[in-house]
Amino acid sequence: MKAILRASRIGRVILRYRLDALLEGTPAERWLRLAKPFVPRASAEIAAQSRGARLRLALQELGPIFVKFGQILSTRRDLIPADVAEELTLLQDRVKPFDGQAARLIVEAALGLPVSVAFASFDTVPLASASIAQVHAATLPPDANGVRREVVVKVLRPDIERQIDADIALLHSLATLVERTHPRADKIRPREVVAEIEGTLAAELDLQREGANASVLRRFWEGSDDLYVPEVIWSHTAERALTLERVYGIPSDDIAKLDAAGIDRKALAAKGVRVFYTQVFRDNFFHADAHAGNIWVDSDPERRLNPRFIALDFGIMGQLSQEDQYYLAENFMAIFHKDYRRMAELHVEAGWMPSNVRIDELEAAARSVCEPYFTRPLSEISLAQVLIKLFRVAQRYELTLQPQLILLQKTLLNIEGVGRQLDPKLDIWAVARPVLERILRERYSPRRVLRELGKRLPEIMTHAPDMPRLVHSWLKQQVEGRHQIDIRSPELLALDLSLRKLQTRVVTAITGSGLLVVAAVLYGLHPDGWYLGTVPVWSWISGGAGSAALLVAWLRR
C-alpha cells in the first residue's frame, strides 16, 4: 500500500512539473494522461523553466533519496542530455537535521560505549546535515599529555536503510516498466542506472568502508604539500559512526575568502589538476565526489604561497582496471598529439567497442570532435568535455563503458571546474601533459618492471616448472592441427599465416619472460662475481636479453 501511495505521489509531481514527456510512448504516459485533470497545473514560473530545471525541482520535492538519485544521474552524461546533466549538478544534498540526542544514541549503539565515556565533549547541534548522514563536532578524552583532540563524528540517519530500500524497490519497478515499454530503453538502460545508484548508496551507508577509503587515500598522500587527508580515529569508528580528525579550511569555491587569506590561486589550480591525474594513474584510487563542497583549501597562513587542498567525504572512490588505466592514459596522449587514428584504435583495443567497427570511420568521428577544440585558446580547452564528446560520438558505434570510467568523466569535469574557478586562465593541457608523460614513463620503466617481477617471484617460481611442458603441449597441438587442415581458400591461408606469426610471438615472449625471471632470481640470490652497481652483471645480461625478446614480440603485433 505504501508503495502505491509513493508511486501516486511521484506521478503527481511528474505532472505538476510537466515532466510527462519523459515517459512518452510508455503505458505510464496513458495513466498520467488520465490523472492530469485531477492534478493542479504548474505555475507560470515553473512552466517557464527548462526541462532540466523542472526535473531538478521535482527531485528536490520528492525528497533526499531522489536528490541523491539526481546527483548520481548527473554523472551519466552518456545517457542524459547535456543541458539536463548540467542542471542536475546544481542539486544540493542539504536537508533538515535530525535530533542531536538521537545522534548520541546511534553513536553509543555503534561504538558500544556511552558518548560521555567515548568523548570528552559531543555537540548535539550538527555542523552539517545531508540525506544520508550528519556531522557533529566532538573532542576525544585527554591523551597522555593531557591534550583533548578535536574530531568530527559522521552519524547515519536513523532508519535510513529502510527508507532507501523502499525507494530503491520502487525505482527498480519503474525501471523494469520503462525497460519493457520505452522506445529508447536500450539507450537509457534504466535497470543499469538504478543498479548503479543502489551500489553507490550501499557504499555510502557503510561508514567503516568510508573510513577505510580515507585511510588508503591518506597513506598515498602522507607528507604531501598538495593534498591533506584527515586521519581516521579507528577506535571511535563503526558501520554507523565515523570519527575523523577535525580540519579547518576554506571551501575551494569561496574565492573572496581565498583572496582575503592571500592564497595563491594560480598555484592551487595547477595543483588540483596534478593531484587528480596522480590519483588516477599513479595510485589508481581517486576521489570520485570531488565537488567544491568536498574540497577545501588549507587555511594555515604559512601555506599562502604553497597552498594545499584538504579532501573531505570519502564515500565514493574510483578505481580503474590496469587495462583501462593504460588505454585512458594512451588516449589522452593521442589527444595531445592529435593522433586520431591511434585514438580510434585504442577505443577498439580497450574493448570499449566491437572489433568489427571500421577504424577509418571512428578516426573521422574523433577528428570531427577534436579539431574544433584545437582552434580555441588553450585556457578554454576542456579535456573532460573532449573525452565526454568522444564517448558520446562513439555511442553510435555501440560503445560500452564501465561505470568506473563514467565516474572518472564526472570527476574530471568537477576538477576542471574547480581549477578554472580558481584560475580562469588555467591551461589544463599544459599541466596534465607532463604529469601523464612522467607517470607513463615511471609506470613502464625497466626498474618498475623488475620490481613487479620481484613481487611476483614466488608465484612465477611456483608455475615455472610447468611452463616447458605446457608450451610443448600447446605447440604440439598447433602442429598437429595445421597438418590436419587442408588449406584452400585465401581466408584460411591468411589465418594460417596469422597463427604462424602468433606462434612465433608466443615463443619469443615466453623466452623473454623466462630470461627476465632468471634476471630477477639472480638479483635476489646475490651470487658471487661481477656487479654493475648493486646488480649482478649476469642479471643485467639476462634482463637485457629478456627485454629485447619481449620488445621483438611486441613489435611483431
UniProtKB/Swiss-Prot annotation:
Q: Which family does it belong to?
A: Belongs to the ABC1 family. UbiB subfamily.
Location in or out of the cell: Cell inner membrane
Lineage of source species = Bacteria, Pseudomonadati, Pseudomonadota, Gammaproteobacteria, Lysobacterales
Its main subcellular localisation, reduced to a broad class, is membrane
Q: So where does ATP get bound?
A: L127, A128, S129, A130, S131, I132, A133, Q134, V135, K154
InterPro entries in the record = ABC1_dom, Kinase-like_dom_sf, UbiB, UbiB_bact, UbiB_kinase
- Decide whether keyword Transmembrane helix is in the record: yes
List, in alphabetical order, the Gene Ontology terms for molecular function in this entry.
Answer: ATP binding; protein kinase activity
Any one annotated GO CC term: plasma membrane
Keywords noted in UniProt? ATP-binding, Cell inner membrane, Cell membrane, Kinase, Membrane, Nucleotide-binding, Transferase, Transmembrane, Transmembrane helix, Ubiquinone biosynthesis
- Transmembrane segments annotated in the record for this chain: 506-526, 535-555
Question: What CDD domains has UniProt attached to this entry?
Answer: UbiB
Instruction: Kindly provide the name given to this protein in its UniProt entry.
Output: Probable protein kinase UbiB
Check the record and name the HAMAP family matching this protein.
UbiB
> What residues sit in the active site?
D289 (proton acceptor)
E.C. number(s) listed in UniProt: 2.7.-.-
